[in-house]
Every structure is written in C-alpha cells, then in structure tokens.
Regions:
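The substrate-binding groove and active-site-proximal loops of carbohydrate-active enzymes
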Residues: 41-47, 70-71, 97-104, 144-148
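Alpha-helix-loop-beta-strand connector modules within alpha/beta enzyme cores
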Residues: 80-98, 153, 157, 164
C-alpha cells in the first residue's frame, strides 16, 4: 500500500500576523484597505497579493513531495474549483482535491467543468464530494434537502457524471435528476474522469 501526503490550501485566510495587520497576504483581512485577492493592498507597498501567497504554498507543497492539496469548501471562503484552476497553471504535478456539495452544481455543469479542468491541468483534479455540514448554514445557502436525502442525491449525481463521461447520448431518470441524451464529446470526452473520494462523520 502506498501512503500519500496532501497539503491543505487556506481559502479562508492564513497569516503569521494578527488579523487586520496590513502585511496580511494570507487575505481575509476585514479592514477597508484589504486586498481584493489578485491585487495587493496599497498600504503594503508591493505587488504580492493573496493569490500569489496561495501559489507559493502550492509550489512549496509540490517541491516538498506532497501528492496534492486539499481545498476545503469553507462557507465564507473562496470557491475551490476557481482557485485550483488558477493554481494548476502554477504547478506541474500537484493534484487538487476540491471539496464541493453536489447541490451546488448540476451534474452536467460539474461534468463539463471537471473535463475542462482535466484538459487544462493534465488530469490533476480529485473530487471530494461532501453532503454534510451545518443544517442551518446549508439552508441559508439554498440547500433544501435534509441529511439522508442529500446522500441519495449524491449517488444520483455521480451516476449522471459517470454516464455523461462514458456516453455521448446518456439517458437517466432518478428521483432528483433526469437526462435525455446528454454526454461529453470530442476532446472533453477523452479527458480522464477525476478520482472521486468522500469522507464524513455521519452515523446514519
């Protein structure tokens, strides 16, 4: 058995300085002069911004032999797929484990986005499919399904993704999703489907 080590990229701020310090390139500085992410704060005095900091962390993980990096789906953080797509161009071998809720994307949208990412990155996307979290926060963000139903939906979601990936004309009818002839074609269909993983603490 091979053991792999994965780093974690901070999508909700990270800094050696106290919150609010002008030198905070780890971002999530809540002060009015805070960085926008791509552009450094004018009060810092240089052009090193939050996305540059994340690039350094990703490159350091790659140089030090990590197999990949986890990008968590923090409720108020940056979106993992967007950030990892930017960082894929800054690295050569590092895999990106992007956490997401199936309810945030349609199966077709997720399939097309993942295939595009795989083409751009050379097949370095890993999906961390999550269904859990705070019920209150999930409802606040538009998630209508209760705990058990989210797991059933996730199974259907992945059935559709695999079907779209393997067929140019895929048909499916489930409880939450239906497809009538969709599927990847051309170069997108030749991209490798992401490794899919999931973790949780549910006891039901």
């Amino acid at each position: 058995m091979t053991i792999e080590f994965f780093a974690r990229l901070p999508l909700h701020g990270e800094t050696q300085y106290i919150p609010g310090d002008n030198r905070n390139r780890g971002d999530w500085n809540r002060q009015p002069h805070a960085s926008t992410g791509a552009v450094s704060s004018s009060e810092v005095g240089d052009d090193f911004a939050y996305v540059d900091y994340l690039s350094q962390v990703a490159r350091a993980a790659e140089i030090n032999g990590f197999s990949g990096a986890l990008l968590v789906n923090a409720p108020f953080g940056d979106e993992p797929w967007i950030v990892s797509a930017a960082l894929a161009r800054e690295t050569k071998r590092l895999r990106f484990v992007d956490a997401f809720h199936p309810g945030h994307f349609s199966p077709w949208q997720a399939t097309q986005m993942a295939a595009s990412f795989q083409r751009i990155s050379g097949g370095r996307l890993v999906w961390n499919v999550i269904q859990g979290g705070s019920d209150g926060l999930l409802r606040a963000n538009g998630e209508p399904l209760p705990h058990d139903e989210r797991y059933v939906r996730a199974i259907e979601f992945l059935d559709l993704v695999k079907g779209f990936w393997a067929n140019e004309s895929f048909h499916y009818k489930g409880r939450y999703y239906e497809a009538n002839g969709g599927g990847l074609r051309g170069p997108l269909a030749r991209a490798p489907i992401p490794t899919i993983c999931s973790a949780g603490t549910s006891d039901g």
